[in-house]
Amino acid sequence: MNSHSRKITDHVYWCGVLDAALRTFDVIMNTEWGTTYNAYFIDADKPALIDTSKSYLSELYLSRVRELVDLDKVQYIVCNHFEPDHSGTLEQLLKLAPNAVPVMSKVGERFFRGLVDYDGETLIIEEDGQKLDLGNLELEFYKTPFLHWPDTMCTWLPADKALFTCDIFGCHYADDRLLSDRVGDFHQAYKYYFDVILRPFKKHLRQAMELVGHLPLEHIMVGHGPLIHGKQEVEHYWGLYEEWSQPLKPEGDKPLCFVFSASSYGMTHRLGKAAAAGAREAGMQTHFFDVNDLEPGRLIDEAEMADLILVGSDTIAGDALAPVWNALALFALVPQKRSKTAGAFGSYGWSGEAAPAIQQRLEQFKFKTPEEPLRVVLRPTEDDLAAAHAWGVRLAENALG
């Protein structure tokens, strides 16, 4: 593994690196199959490179490039996305390739300045379809923001019908065979990557696919994992993205209120069930869960489908319970949070910090929180349950607009 550069199409060479031993990526992702940092060389009259590698693999990456071209002959370095796993070698490369002009989106320039010490010429992509003349070849650029940083763009090489997408259509999967039609089944890694990296940005993904959907794609040159190679492969993986990028909808014809809570003695659960009953009275269907019974995928699905989300916890040692915080962390993966209404509730003994703390976290996620947190001391009375019911009605009415 990690042997040499590879020719992929008539004018495209892979010059990336494999990191097969990697088991955690960016702190948050398990990478049981390792990953690749894919980078590319365009063999043109004006030679160009697309993306680089993580900094600790810079020597291996540079050795790949030197197999293909003298660095002082490189004319352009296209930077589709500036996250350091794709730009970590860029500063070193610019010093070694003095004639190369870095190419980036307008938004990307801010990240470039924050990551790279460089005061030379740059080429900024201002418009979709903007072209770059490489002599015998031409590149086109399409802005695809928030997939998954604001700077992201795709690069199209018409001559080879190849689209360079960086993190879009990729996955963490290291295999020296490189091409999707040769490495075997990597669908588990492919879906996991989509869920963690791109699912929060479904709306942007649908817009990007519409933007580049007219291109006669035969190759998708991804930033991580197997290169999507051949028209049939492109159709397959494009189809998966079309399916996965659609909004999830609850069964039935009523909008969903999703409620979950952590409750040592059932008192907080009683509040949540009363609030759920109020939401049903207002015209919603409800799904109620003890947080300990929710596996992560189900929690994210429920939150995506819901128009109203209610989160509850007892207060213990001045805080919400750990399973609730762990569940809330997964909300980072939920699309369209700004369009959803949410509220927090909880029973407490003497201090009652849990519900306000949960509400603050919901607000940080940009949920709409039109009601104050609902709190009661210890066992809810009938009046408390009636108040919880009314609270649920009001929140549901807000969610229903």
Feature map (PLM): residue ranges:
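Active-site metal-binding motif and surrounding structural segment of the metallo-beta-lactamase
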Residues: D45, Y56-V103
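FMN-binding flavodoxin-like domain, especially the glycine-rich phosphate-binding loop
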Residues: H4, D175-L178, D185-L227, E233, ...
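Conserved beta-strand hairpin/beta-sheet module of binuclear metal-dependent hydrolase folds
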Residues: S5-E67, C154-L157, K161-T165, C257, ...
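Terminal amphipathic helices with adjacent charged low-complexity linkers/tails
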Residues: V222-K254
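Active-site neighborhood of phospho(di)ester-bond hydrolases with catalytic His/Asp-centered motifs
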Residues: I50-T52, V74-F82, P102-K106, L163-C166, ...
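Short acidic active-site motifs
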Residues: T89, L294-L299
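Metallo-beta-lactamase
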Residues: R6-D10, M104-T152, H204-M209
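Active-site-proximal loop/helix segment associated with metal-binding centers of metalloenzymes
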Residues: H148, T152, D160, I168-R199, ...
